[in-house]
Protein backbone atom coordinates (compact mmCIF):
# COMPACT_ATOMS: atom_id res chain seq x y z
CA UNK A 1 0.00 0.00 0.00
CA UNK A 2 1.11 3.52 -0.66
CA UNK A 3 0.93 4.65 2.97
CA UNK A 4 2.76 1.54 4.13
CA UNK A 5 5.49 2.22 1.62
CA UNK A 6 5.74 5.79 2.86
CA UNK A 7 6.48 4.57 6.38
CA UNK A 8 9.04 2.12 5.04
CA UNK A 9 10.84 4.01 2.26
CA UNK A 10 10.41 7.80 2.54
CA UNK A 11 13.59 9.61 3.76
CA UNK A 12 13.46 9.79 7.56
CA UNK A 13 13.67 13.57 7.95
CA UNK A 14 10.90 14.13 5.42
CA UNK A 15 8.83 11.27 6.87
CA UNK A 16 9.08 12.57 10.44
CA UNK A 17 7.73 15.98 9.46
CA UNK A 18 5.21 14.47 7.04
CA UNK A 19 3.83 12.35 9.90
CA UNK A 20 4.36 14.76 12.79
CA UNK A 21 3.64 18.25 11.49
CA UNK A 22 -0.13 17.76 11.13
CA UNK A 23 -0.24 16.28 14.64
CA UNK A 24 1.89 19.12 16.01
CA UNK A 25 -0.43 21.70 14.46
CA UNK A 26 -3.51 19.96 15.82
CA UNK A 27 -1.94 19.64 19.27
CA UNK A 28 -1.03 23.33 19.27
CA UNK A 29 -4.68 24.05 18.49
CA UNK A 30 -5.55 21.67 21.34
CA UNK A 31 -3.17 23.54 23.65
CA UNK A 32 -4.72 26.83 22.55
CA UNK A 33 -8.21 25.68 23.41
CA UNK A 34 -7.04 24.32 26.77
CA UNK A 35 -5.59 27.72 27.59
CA UNK A 36 -8.54 29.67 26.18
CA UNK A 37 -10.87 27.48 28.27
CA UNK A 38 -8.99 28.39 31.45
CA UNK A 39 -8.60 32.04 30.45
CA UNK A 40 -12.35 32.45 30.07
CA UNK A 41 -12.93 30.67 33.39
CA UNK A 42 -10.35 32.92 35.10
CA UNK A 43 -12.33 35.96 33.95
CA UNK A 44 -15.29 34.69 36.00
CA UNK A 45 -13.32 34.46 39.26
CA UNK A 46 -10.14 33.05 40.76
CA UNK A 47 -12.29 30.48 42.58
CA UNK A 48 -13.59 29.25 39.21
CA UNK A 49 -10.05 28.82 37.92
CA UNK A 50 -9.07 27.02 41.14
CA UNK A 51 -12.01 24.61 40.72
CA UNK A 52 -10.98 23.75 37.17
CA UNK A 53 -7.33 23.43 38.26
CA UNK A 54 -8.23 21.01 41.07
CA UNK A 55 -10.35 19.00 38.60
CA UNK A 56 -7.31 18.51 36.36
CA UNK A 57 -5.96 15.31 38.02
CA UNK A 58 -9.28 13.48 37.59
CA UNK A 59 -9.78 14.81 34.08
CA UNK A 60 -6.23 13.84 33.16
CA UNK A 61 -6.75 10.37 34.64
CA UNK A 62 -9.65 9.87 32.23
CA UNK A 63 -7.59 11.09 29.28
CA UNK A 64 -4.74 8.83 30.42
CA UNK A 65 -6.96 5.78 30.10
CA UNK A 66 -8.21 6.86 26.67
CA UNK A 67 -4.84 7.92 25.28
CA UNK A 68 -2.81 5.07 26.79
CA UNK A 69 -5.18 2.47 25.38
CA UNK A 70 -4.91 4.18 21.99
CA UNK A 71 -1.10 4.03 22.24
CA UNK A 72 -1.31 0.25 22.58
CA UNK A 73 -3.69 0.01 19.63
CA UNK A 74 -1.50 2.28 17.50
CA UNK A 75 1.73 0.37 18.16
CA UNK A 76 0.14 -3.08 17.73
CA UNK A 77 -1.63 -2.02 14.54
CA UNK A 78 1.57 -0.47 13.18
CA UNK A 79 3.44 -3.72 13.68
CA UNK A 80 0.67 -5.69 11.97
CA UNK A 81 0.71 -3.35 8.97
CA UNK A 82 4.51 -3.49 8.81
CA UNK A 83 4.31 -7.30 8.76
CA UNK A 84 1.60 -7.15 6.02
CA UNK A 85 -1.01 -8.75 8.32
CA UNK A 86 -4.19 -6.90 7.30
CA UNK A 87 -6.61 -9.14 9.21
CA UNK A 88 -4.77 -8.63 12.49
CA UNK A 89 -4.60 -4.86 11.92
CA UNK A 90 -8.39 -4.73 11.43
CA UNK A 91 -8.99 -6.84 14.52
CA UNK A 92 -6.76 -4.58 16.61
CA UNK A 93 -8.66 -1.50 15.41
CA UNK A 94 -12.10 -2.93 16.24
CA UNK A 95 -11.02 -4.09 19.69
CA UNK A 96 -9.58 -0.63 20.28
CA UNK A 97 -13.00 0.92 19.68
CA UNK A 98 -14.56 -1.62 22.05
CA UNK A 99 -12.07 -0.65 24.76
CA UNK A 100 -12.85 3.04 24.18
CA UNK A 101 -16.53 2.33 24.95
CA UNK A 102 -15.66 0.36 28.08
CA UNK A 103 -13.43 3.23 29.25
CA UNK A 104 -16.25 5.74 28.77
CA UNK A 105 -18.67 3.67 30.88
CA UNK A 106 -16.11 3.29 33.66
CA UNK A 107 -15.18 6.99 33.80
CA UNK A 108 -18.80 8.09 33.57
CA UNK A 109 -19.75 6.03 36.63
CA UNK A 110 -16.71 7.22 38.60
CA UNK A 111 -17.27 10.87 37.69
CA UNK A 112 -20.93 10.85 38.68
CA UNK A 113 -20.38 9.05 42.00
CA UNK A 114 -17.00 10.19 43.36
CA UNK A 115 -16.65 13.80 42.21
CA UNK A 116 -17.71 15.40 45.51
CA UNK A 117 -15.39 13.23 47.60
CA UNK A 118 -12.53 14.01 45.21
CA UNK A 119 -12.82 17.78 45.70
CA UNK A 120 -13.40 17.59 49.45
CA UNK A 121 -10.14 15.66 49.77
CA UNK A 122 -8.30 18.71 48.40
CA UNK A 123 -10.04 21.78 49.83
CA UNK A 124 -12.70 22.83 52.32
CA UNK A 125 -13.77 25.96 50.39
CA UNK A 126 -17.40 25.20 49.57
CA UNK A 127 -17.59 27.52 46.55
CA UNK A 128 -14.67 25.73 44.89
CA UNK A 129 -16.14 22.31 45.71
CA UNK A 130 -19.52 23.13 44.18
CA UNK A 131 -18.08 24.59 40.97
CA UNK A 132 -15.62 21.73 40.66
CA UNK A 133 -18.43 19.19 40.97
CA UNK A 134 -20.44 20.90 38.25
CA UNK A 135 -17.47 20.86 35.90
CA UNK A 136 -16.15 17.35 36.52
CA UNK A 137 -19.49 15.51 36.51
CA UNK A 138 -20.30 16.89 33.06
CA UNK A 139 -16.84 16.30 31.56
CA UNK A 140 -16.58 12.72 32.83
CA UNK A 141 -20.26 11.81 32.55
CA UNK A 142 -20.29 12.58 28.81
CA UNK A 143 -16.76 11.36 28.09
CA UNK A 144 -17.70 9.09 25.16
CA UNK A 145 -16.65 11.95 22.87
CA UNK A 146 -13.05 12.13 24.08
CA UNK A 147 -12.67 8.33 24.25
CA UNK A 148 -13.95 7.87 20.71
CA UNK A 149 -12.03 10.86 19.36
CA UNK A 150 -8.64 9.79 20.73
CA UNK A 151 -9.00 6.19 19.56
CA UNK A 152 -10.14 7.07 16.05
CA UNK A 153 -7.43 9.71 15.66
CA UNK A 154 -4.81 7.09 16.53
CA UNK A 155 -6.21 4.79 13.84
CA UNK A 156 -5.71 7.59 11.32
CA UNK A 157 -2.20 8.33 12.58
CA UNK A 158 -1.18 4.68 12.64
CA UNK A 159 -1.99 4.26 8.96
CA UNK A 160 -0.14 7.39 7.84
CA UNK A 161 -3.19 9.71 7.67
CA UNK A 162 -1.85 12.27 10.14
CA UNK A 163 -3.35 15.18 8.19
CA UNK A 164 -6.84 13.73 8.71
CA UNK A 165 -6.28 13.40 12.45
CA UNK A 166 -5.30 17.06 12.45
CA UNK A 167 -8.64 17.94 10.90
CA UNK A 168 -10.61 16.08 13.57
CA UNK A 169 -8.70 17.47 16.53
CA UNK A 170 -8.70 20.96 15.09
CA UNK A 171 -12.45 20.79 14.49
CA UNK A 172 -13.16 19.88 18.11
CA UNK A 173 -10.84 22.56 19.44
CA UNK A 174 -12.27 25.33 17.25
CA UNK A 175 -15.84 24.42 18.21
CA UNK A 176 -14.84 24.54 21.88
CA UNK A 177 -13.17 27.93 21.49
CA UNK A 178 -16.29 29.35 19.79
CA UNK A 179 -18.74 27.91 22.32
CA UNK A 180 -16.75 28.75 25.48
CA UNK A 181 -17.54 32.49 25.68
CA UNK A 182 -21.12 31.86 24.56
CA UNK A 183 -21.90 29.39 27.34
CA UNK A 184 -19.73 31.07 30.01
CA UNK A 185 -20.67 34.72 29.47
CA UNK A 186 -23.72 35.02 27.17
CA UNK A 187 -25.66 32.25 28.92
CA UNK A 188 -23.91 33.11 32.25
CA UNK A 189 -23.21 29.44 33.01
CA UNK A 190 -19.66 29.86 34.37
CA UNK A 191 -17.67 26.64 34.80
CA UNK A 192 -20.74 24.60 33.83
CA UNK A 193 -20.73 26.36 30.47
CA UNK A 194 -17.02 25.61 30.04
CA UNK A 195 -17.71 21.91 30.65
CA UNK A 196 -20.62 21.82 28.18
CA UNK A 197 -18.53 23.56 25.50
CA UNK A 198 -15.75 21.02 26.08
CA UNK A 199 -17.93 17.93 25.62
CA UNK A 200 -19.71 19.35 22.56
CA UNK A 201 -16.32 19.93 20.91
CA UNK A 202 -15.20 16.39 21.79
CA UNK A 203 -18.39 14.79 20.46
CA UNK A 204 -18.13 16.70 17.17
CA UNK A 205 -14.50 15.61 16.78
CA UNK A 206 -15.49 12.00 17.54
CA UNK A 207 -18.20 11.97 14.86
CA UNK A 208 -15.88 13.59 12.31
CA UNK A 209 -13.08 11.10 13.07
CA UNK A 210 -15.48 8.17 12.67
CA UNK A 211 -16.62 9.44 9.27
CA UNK A 212 -13.02 9.92 8.10
CA UNK A 213 -12.03 6.41 9.19
CA UNK A 214 -14.99 4.89 7.38
CA UNK A 215 -14.62 6.96 4.20
CA UNK A 216 -10.95 7.96 3.89
CA UNK A 217 -8.92 5.25 5.62
CA UNK A 218 -8.84 2.19 3.32
CA UNK A 219 -5.93 0.64 5.25
CA UNK A 220 -8.29 -0.24 8.12
CA UNK A 221 -11.67 -1.93 7.70
CA UNK A 222 -14.13 -1.16 10.52
CA UNK A 223 -16.93 -3.74 10.48
CA UNK A 224 -19.27 -3.43 13.48
CA UNK A 225 -21.78 -6.15 12.58
CA UNK A 226 -20.99 -9.42 14.31
CA UNK A 227 -18.09 -7.98 16.29
CA UNK A 228 -16.84 -10.04 19.23
CA UNK A 229 -14.10 -8.91 21.63
CA UNK A 230 -10.84 -10.76 21.05
CA UNK A 231 -9.39 -11.15 24.53
CA UNK A 232 -5.97 -12.18 23.25
CA UNK A 233 -5.76 -9.01 21.16
CA UNK A 234 -7.01 -6.96 24.11
CA UNK A 235 -4.30 -8.51 26.26
CA UNK A 236 -1.69 -7.58 23.67
CA UNK A 237 -3.05 -4.02 23.45
CA UNK A 238 -2.69 -3.53 27.19
CA UNK A 239 0.66 -5.29 27.31
CA UNK A 240 1.82 -2.27 25.31
CA UNK A 241 -0.68 0.37 26.38
CA UNK A 242 -1.20 -0.31 30.10
CA UNK A 243 2.23 0.99 31.11
CA UNK A 244 1.38 4.11 29.10
CA UNK A 245 -1.98 4.40 30.91
CA UNK A 246 -0.28 4.02 34.27
CA UNK A 247 2.53 6.36 33.23
CA UNK A 248 0.08 9.14 32.38
CA UNK A 249 -2.05 8.34 35.42
CA UNK A 250 1.04 8.79 37.57
CA UNK A 251 0.97 12.40 36.39
CA UNK A 252 -2.55 12.74 37.79
CA UNK A 253 -1.46 11.30 41.13
CA UNK A 254 1.53 13.65 41.16
CA UNK A 255 -0.67 16.69 40.44
CA UNK A 256 -3.17 15.67 43.12
CA UNK A 257 -0.44 15.22 45.74
CA UNK A 258 1.35 18.39 44.66
CA UNK A 259 -1.89 20.35 45.07
CA UNK A 260 -2.23 18.89 48.57
CA UNK A 261 1.35 19.90 49.43
CA UNK A 262 0.85 23.44 48.11
CA UNK A 263 -2.52 24.00 49.79
CA UNK A 264 -1.20 22.65 53.10
CA UNK A 265 2.32 24.08 53.32
CA UNK A 266 2.61 27.03 50.92
CA UNK A 267 1.74 30.37 52.49
CA UNK A 268 -0.54 31.19 49.52
CA UNK A 269 -2.52 27.91 49.91
CA UNK A 270 -5.22 27.61 47.16
CA UNK A 271 -3.61 30.42 45.16
CA UNK A 272 -0.39 28.41 44.97
CA UNK A 273 -2.34 25.40 43.65
CA UNK A 274 -4.03 27.67 41.11
CA UNK A 275 -0.66 29.03 39.97
CA UNK A 276 0.53 25.44 39.59
CA UNK A 277 -2.58 24.73 37.50
CA UNK A 278 -1.81 27.73 35.28
CA UNK A 279 1.71 26.38 34.78
CA UNK A 280 0.24 23.11 33.49
CA UNK A 281 -1.96 24.99 31.04
CA UNK A 282 0.95 27.10 29.80
CA UNK A 283 3.42 24.25 29.50
CA UNK A 284 1.07 22.49 27.08
CA UNK A 285 2.25 24.96 24.43
CA UNK A 286 5.75 23.57 24.91
CA UNK A 287 4.98 19.91 25.54
CA UNK A 288 2.18 19.45 22.98
CA UNK A 289 4.46 19.97 19.95
CA UNK A 290 6.90 17.45 21.42
CA UNK A 291 4.11 14.96 22.06
CA UNK A 292 2.91 15.58 18.50
CA UNK A 293 6.39 14.85 17.20
CA UNK A 294 6.47 11.73 19.36
CA UNK A 295 3.08 10.54 18.11
CA UNK A 296 4.28 10.92 14.54
CA UNK A 297 7.49 8.99 15.19
CA UNK A 298 5.89 6.05 17.08
CA UNK A 299 4.22 4.52 13.98
CA UNK A 300 7.46 5.06 12.01
CA UNK A 301 9.48 3.13 14.58
CA UNK A 302 6.76 0.48 15.01
CA UNK A 303 6.41 -0.07 11.25
CA UNK A 304 10.16 -0.33 10.64
CA UNK A 305 10.48 -2.66 13.62
CA UNK A 306 7.89 -4.92 11.98
CA UNK A 307 9.81 -4.60 8.69
CA UNK A 308 13.16 -5.19 10.50
CA UNK A 309 14.68 -1.94 9.23
CA UNK A 310 17.15 -1.14 12.02
CA UNK A 311 18.87 1.79 10.32
CA UNK A 312 15.59 3.65 9.74
CA UNK A 313 14.44 2.97 13.30
CA UNK A 314 17.62 4.36 14.87
CA UNK A 315 17.63 7.40 12.59
CA UNK A 316 14.00 8.20 13.45
CA UNK A 317 14.68 7.92 17.20
CA UNK A 318 17.83 10.06 17.01
CA UNK A 319 16.22 12.81 14.93
CA UNK A 320 13.13 12.95 17.15
CA UNK A 321 15.30 13.35 20.28
CA UNK A 322 17.19 16.25 18.68
CA UNK A 323 14.06 18.03 17.47
CA UNK A 324 12.27 17.52 20.80
CA UNK A 325 15.20 18.96 22.74
CA UNK A 326 15.28 22.05 20.51
CA UNK A 327 11.58 22.72 21.11
CA UNK A 328 11.96 22.30 24.87
CA UNK A 329 14.95 24.67 25.06
CA UNK A 330 12.94 27.32 23.18
CA UNK A 331 10.06 26.81 25.62
CA UNK A 332 12.39 27.16 28.59
CA UNK A 333 13.68 30.48 27.21
CA UNK A 334 10.12 31.84 26.91
CA UNK A 335 9.25 30.82 30.48
CA UNK A 336 12.47 32.40 31.78
CA UNK A 337 11.99 35.71 29.95
CA UNK A 338 8.23 36.35 30.09
CA UNK A 339 6.67 34.68 33.18
CA UNK A 340 4.68 37.73 34.28
CA UNK A 341 3.25 38.25 30.80
CA UNK A 342 2.15 34.62 30.65
CA UNK A 343 0.45 34.80 34.06
CA UNK A 344 -1.32 38.08 33.28
CA UNK A 345 -3.25 36.27 30.55
CA UNK A 346 -5.18 34.64 33.41
CA UNK A 347 -5.81 37.96 35.21
CA UNK A 348 -3.28 37.00 37.85
CA UNK A 349 -3.51 38.88 41.15
CA UNK A 350 -0.43 40.29 42.86
CA UNK A 351 -0.35 37.25 45.13
CA UNK A 352 -0.53 34.88 42.17
CA UNK A 353 2.25 36.78 40.39
CA UNK A 354 4.48 36.57 43.46
CA UNK A 355 3.91 32.79 43.52
CA UNK A 356 3.78 32.11 39.79
CA UNK A 357 6.80 34.02 38.46
CA UNK A 358 9.43 32.05 40.42
CA UNK A 359 7.42 28.85 39.87
CA UNK A 360 7.52 29.20 36.07
CA UNK A 361 11.19 30.12 36.02
CA UNK A 362 12.33 27.30 38.30
CA UNK A 363 10.13 24.50 36.91
CA UNK A 364 11.01 25.36 33.30
CA UNK A 365 14.67 24.58 33.98
CA UNK A 366 13.61 20.93 33.68
CA UNK A 367 12.44 21.41 30.06
CA UNK A 368 15.89 21.03 28.51
CA UNK A 369 16.12 17.47 29.86
CA UNK A 370 12.50 16.48 29.26
CA UNK A 371 12.71 16.52 25.44
CA UNK A 372 15.07 13.56 25.19
CA UNK A 373 13.09 11.67 27.84
CA UNK A 374 9.87 12.04 25.84
CA UNK A 375 11.48 11.07 22.53
CA UNK A 376 13.16 7.96 23.93
CA UNK A 377 9.97 7.09 25.79
CA UNK A 378 8.17 7.03 22.44
CA UNK A 379 10.64 4.46 21.15
CA UNK A 380 9.96 2.31 24.22
CA UNK A 381 6.23 2.36 23.41
CA UNK A 382 6.72 1.64 19.71
CA UNK A 383 8.86 -1.41 20.47
CA UNK A 384 6.53 -2.86 23.09
CA UNK A 385 8.75 -1.85 26.02
CA UNK A 386 6.43 0.69 27.62
CA UNK A 387 7.45 -0.71 31.00
CA UNK A 388 10.65 1.35 30.65
CA UNK A 389 8.60 4.53 30.23
CA UNK A 390 6.56 3.52 33.26
CA UNK A 391 9.69 2.99 35.36
CA UNK A 392 11.05 6.41 34.39
CA UNK A 393 7.71 8.13 35.05
CA UNK A 394 7.22 6.54 38.46
CA UNK A 395 10.77 7.37 39.53
CA UNK A 396 10.48 10.97 38.36
CA UNK A 397 7.00 11.86 39.60
CA UNK A 398 6.40 9.68 42.66
CA UNK A 399 9.68 8.26 43.96
CA UNK A 400 11.57 11.56 43.57
CA UNK A 401 9.36 14.55 42.82
CA UNK A 402 6.71 14.25 45.53
CA UNK A 403 9.03 13.32 48.43
CA UNK A 404 11.51 16.04 47.44
CA UNK A 405 8.67 18.57 47.07
CA UNK A 406 7.31 17.58 50.48
CA UNK A 407 10.70 18.03 52.15
CA UNK A 408 11.41 21.32 50.36
CA UNK A 409 7.93 22.62 51.22
CA UNK A 410 8.58 21.89 54.89
CA UNK A 411 11.96 23.61 54.75
CA UNK A 412 10.46 26.53 52.84
CA UNK A 413 7.67 26.94 55.37
CA UNK A 414 10.05 27.02 58.32
CA UNK A 415 12.55 29.32 56.57
CA UNK A 416 10.00 31.60 54.90
CA UNK A 417 11.14 30.63 51.38
CA UNK A 418 8.10 29.14 49.61
CA UNK A 419 9.96 29.02 46.28
CA UNK A 420 12.07 26.05 47.40
CA UNK A 421 9.24 23.62 46.61
CA UNK A 422 9.51 24.28 42.86
CA UNK A 423 13.12 23.02 42.73
CA UNK A 424 11.76 19.49 43.09
CA UNK A 425 10.97 19.53 39.35
CA UNK A 426 14.46 20.07 37.88
CA UNK A 427 15.98 17.79 40.53
CA UNK A 428 13.64 14.95 39.56
CA UNK A 429 14.18 15.54 35.82
CA UNK A 430 17.96 15.18 36.10
CA UNK A 431 17.59 11.74 37.64
CA UNK A 432 14.87 10.67 35.18
CA UNK A 433 17.09 11.55 32.21
CA UNK A 434 19.81 9.29 33.58
CA UNK A 435 17.37 6.41 34.06
CA UNK A 436 15.95 6.96 30.54
CA UNK A 437 19.40 6.73 28.97
CA UNK A 438 20.16 3.55 30.89
CA UNK A 439 16.87 1.98 29.75
CA UNK A 440 17.49 2.93 26.11
CA UNK A 441 21.01 1.51 26.26
CA UNK A 442 19.57 -1.78 27.48
CA UNK A 443 16.85 -1.73 24.78
CA UNK A 444 19.40 -1.09 22.05
CA UNK A 445 21.69 -3.87 23.23
CA UNK A 446 18.98 -6.52 23.70
CA UNK A 447 16.58 -5.70 20.83
CA UNK A 448 17.49 -3.03 18.30
CA UNK A 449 21.08 -4.12 17.65
CA UNK A 450 19.92 -7.66 16.81
CA UNK A 451 17.84 -6.51 13.82
CA UNK A 452 19.34 -6.44 10.30
CA UNK A 453 20.22 -2.89 9.18
CA UNK A 454 18.07 -2.81 6.04
CA UNK A 455 15.48 -5.57 6.36
CA UNK A 456 15.54 -9.39 6.43
CA UNK A 457 16.17 -9.70 2.70
CA UNK A 458 19.62 -8.12 3.20
CA UNK A 459 20.76 -10.55 5.90
CA UNK A 460 23.78 -12.48 4.63
Regions found by a protein language model. Give the residues of each.
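Short loop-to-helix capping motifs
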Residues: 125, 161-162, 190, 269, ...
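Short alpha-helical transmembrane segments in multi-pass integral membrane proteins
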Residues: 1-20, 77-144, 186-242, 301-366, ...
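Transmembrane alpha-helical segments of integral membrane proteins
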Residues: 374, 400-411
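Transmembrane helix-bundle signature of multi-pass secondary active exporters and lipid flippases
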Residues: 23-75, 139-146, 235, 239-304, ...
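Short runs within selected transmembrane alpha-helices of multi-pass transporters and secretion channels
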Residues: 70, 139-157, 165-173, 194-207, ...
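Small-residue-rich hydrophobic transmembrane alpha-helices
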Residues: 49-109, 146-165, 275-333, 337-339, ...
Amino acid sequence: MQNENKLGVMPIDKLIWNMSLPIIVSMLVQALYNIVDSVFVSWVSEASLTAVSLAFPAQNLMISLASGTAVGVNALMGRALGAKDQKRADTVAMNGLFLAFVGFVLCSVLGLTLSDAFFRSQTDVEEIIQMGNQYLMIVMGASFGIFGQLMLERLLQGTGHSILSMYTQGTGAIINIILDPIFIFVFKMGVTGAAIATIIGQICAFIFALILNLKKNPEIHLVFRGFRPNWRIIGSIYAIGLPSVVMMAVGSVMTFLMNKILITYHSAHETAATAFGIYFKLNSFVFMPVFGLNNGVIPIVAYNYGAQQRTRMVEAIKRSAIYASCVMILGMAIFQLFPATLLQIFKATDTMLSVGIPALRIISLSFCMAGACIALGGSFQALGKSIYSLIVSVIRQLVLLIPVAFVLAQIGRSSGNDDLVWWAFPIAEVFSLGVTLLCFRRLYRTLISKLPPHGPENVQ
